[in-house]
Amino acid sequence: MTLDVGPEDELPDWAAAKEFYQKYDPKDVIGRGVSSVVRRCVHRATGQEFAVKIMEVTAERLSPEQLEEVREATRRETHILRQVAGHPHIITLIDSYESSSFMFLVFDLMRKGELFDYLTEKVALSEKETRSIMRSLLEAVSFLHNNNIVHRDLKPENILLDDNMQIRLSDFGFSCHLEPGEKLRELCGTPGYLAPEILKCSMDETHPGYGKEVDLWACGVILFTLLAGSPPFWHRRQILMLRMIMEGQYQFSSPEWDDRSDTVKDLISRLLQVDPVERLTAEQALQHPFFERCEGSQAWNLTPRQRFRVAVWTVLAAGRVALSAHRIRPLTKSALLRDPYALRPVRRLIDNCAFRLYGHWVKKGEQQNRAALFQHRPPGPFPMMGPEEEGDSATIAEDEAMLVLG
């Protein structure tokens, strides 16, 4: 998807990026980050298309400390990407360039864009589609953890889709190496996907820190979000949302969960364990019954007569199923007036009509808020959490000012 070009998207001049321009021809803008622009680019020798992430590192925009921080983070990201190169579900780093004013990272071009945009279009995904996505994601996370790498920013925006709708994990800006037994204390990530131990660590100096388990919590949030179309943890007052995360307060209350299996709900509950020790690892999650599939049984050695009998019985059975499907139980007026949304055919009719009028912003339950998917803020400090209090708009504004997160 091509984006409109603004003043901040101007290309570096030839002198500042000579080495990059000699090999690649930059094209349209396809994405933006906090301090970067992503463009489609074409390899001059082969004509092959790639995506280039361009980061400006100049004193005009950043302080000396920020400049060094961005450079160090990009070098760390480059090192990790080269270490995990070759995994089918992790984005491939093709080239990297660094000048005095700009840094360039060239990746495979993922034409289908972000999983976030796909989810926004679809509203919610089926269990079958979710199973495929989550299996690939957990395989990538397992590979990272086996190489002592923690991602720390797993979310649908950082999961890309290729032409075959296969996922690639991207954006390793917060990733780092973590030796066995080592703990982290740095506050980073996106509010709705932060694990409880990250929040507790930022508020309690005596907290031991967090480890690779934070990635599995984020996987649980992603799994919930794909199936429900909205995140598990949300409140209009962010301080209460953070408390919900730390206490693991979420519900399968929206109508979408009426048609979801108990198996996937069990997997979510095992990933969204507040205690990281009780949380599933990536390998354990991949062994969960949700990912089991029926393997094709061996072909029967049937005679032609037996094959004919099987075909006849199949046709007869299909006919009976078709007849039974048309025998709809009568709908009484009292049942319709009592709770029309509880009746699946009526519910689908209501949803379809509402969707045509209001698009993706149809709220189907008190706990559902699709707008929360779009609420991302820059990193900031956490306050100490006191008893819950009901407040007026001034109190709410104060809470939000104190709880500015990324």
UniProtKB/Swiss-Prot annotation:
Residue intervals of the Protein kinase domain = 24-291
A GO biological-process term: glycogen metabolic process
- Which reaction(s) does its UniProt entry say it catalyses? 2 ATP + phosphorylase b = 2 ADP + phosphorylase a
List, alphabetically, the InterPro entries matched.
Kinase-like_dom_sf, Phosph_kin_gamma, Prot_kinase_dom, Protein_kinase_ATP_BS, Ser/Thr_kinase_AS
The record's region (Calmodulin-binding (domain-C)) falls at: 346-370
User: What is the enzyme's main class?
Assistant: transferase
Region Calmodulin-binding (domain-N), as annotated, extends over 306-330
Matches recorded under Gene3D superfamilies: Phosphorylase Kinase, domain 1, Transferase(Phosphotransferase) domain 1
Q: Subunit composition?
A: Hexadecamer of 4 heterotetramers, each composed of alpha, beta, gamma, and delta subunits. Alpha (PHKA1 or PHKA2) and beta (PHKB) are regulatory subunits, gamma (PHKG1 or PHKG2) is the catalytic subunit, and delta is calmodulin.
Task: From the Swiss-Prot or TrEMBL record, give the protein name.
Answer: Phosphorylase b kinase gamma catalytic chain, liver/testis isoform
Q: Give the organism, scientific name.
A: Bos taurus (Bovine)
